[in-house]
């Protein structure tokens, strides 16, 4: 049978999601915990292979097993074997045709940026930081050019393994909540470092270094060297993965908010 889990984790505790020869990863940590409850080794597949330092409130993973457990048993059992930076939020059984990555129809990322002269202490590693004042209205205006089908080569990491740089950006939103600027990206899929590179470019606009028209020119040029530097991973969250309704998965993703008391 194929079991699907909804997972939340603090990425600052790991060297990314995907298993690697050296370094602590979310996948290795989860596989060890699930394997103990399943009573056999498991191999996980995820919706999004987040980088080192990137967080998730709504990662989706699946694995195959012959072990029979109630959904609540998978949640409680696996969580009992996990350390605090990772938690399983829900579990369900899916058909053999389900795949956490290839069946996903869209994904949502949120970047939370602390825009203040003083760096954050309690939220260090949980939000990005930029001290010069930013114009969120200018950034929101610039972001409109990103919506729709585009070749995002200008915002693609050199080592990106995606077959095509063309993606459908459903929506980009930029809004301020006090000292926080929140960037929301919703697309069918994302390239490696794409969100962090887009945030970097929008920050260039927000601080007045470039106009909104510049971002459209960079997008059209498809040249990575013309864009901004890659922004830090600290404030980036995978906060939603959408699937076709017939899979009947719990919820539609968990969107992290910016509370007055800044804990999540």
Swiss-Prot record:
One of its GO terms (molecular function) is tRNA pseudouridine(38-40) synthase activity. It catalyses: uridine(38/39/40) in tRNA = pseudouridine(38/39/40) in tRNA. Pfam families: PseudoU_synth_1. Keywords: Isomerase, tRNA processing. HAMAP family: TruA (MF_00171). Its EC number is 5.4.99.12. The lineage of its organism: Bacteria, Pseudomonadati, Pseudomonadota, Betaproteobacteria, Rhodocyclales. Substrate binds at residue 109. GO terms for biological process: tRNA pseudouridine synthesis. Transmembrane segments: none annotated. Formation of pseudouridine at positions 38, 39 and 40 in the anticodon stem and loop of transfer RNAs. Belongs to the tRNA pseudouridine synthase TruA family. The active site is at 51 (nucleophile). Homodimer. It is an enzyme of class 5 (isomerase). Disulfide bonds: none annotated. This is tRNA pseudouridine synthase A.
